[in-house]
Amino acid sequence: LAFPGLTPFEEVFQLKAAHYIKYTNGKLSEIQYWKPQKCKKIHYQEEEQYKDLVVQTFRKCVEDLLRPGTQIAANLSSGLDSTSIVSIAAPFLEKRGEILHTYTSIPDEAHDYESDAYFVPDESSAVKKTVACFPNIKSHFIDCKGENALTHLKKFVEEYDLPIKSAINLSWIYQVNHDAHARGCT
């Protein structure tokens, strides 16, 4: 973190992961309740068993967040993170007869993107391939043509009480949140 412990609120600080604060006799003390280096090590015979455990743990983490009876939405790029989450969430929701709304940014064609061999400004074709694998995904492609980070700034500040990390994506974030809210998504 660039500024460990700091939050956007005056005199409100963030604790380190796996810590809590104890107040005793007028003194604050920070106590670590979990130490990853002290966890029991797992020893398997086969490499495949480690892979299975990672997938099983990841699957449980994703599925535990999918509350029944609500519309679920996810941001979907062609990256590993969002694609992995969507690839687990979609079949799980399909078993419950539910759909998954996904949101993908479509870049402004007028913008001059850097020519970098690893930079993909328009990820929509790869996203469409992912979406094609899951019949219960309803994909939404958000075009912020002619907008920039300042377009929705005033409305954003009025509606959200916290700063965001990637202000360059503010217009897209604002539109996704409003569209998802209108659809009843969480």
Language-model features: locations:
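N-terminal segments that mediate ammonia production and transfer
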Residues: 1-45
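ATP-dependent adenylate-handling active sites, centered on carboxylate activation for C-N bond formation
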Residues: 37-186
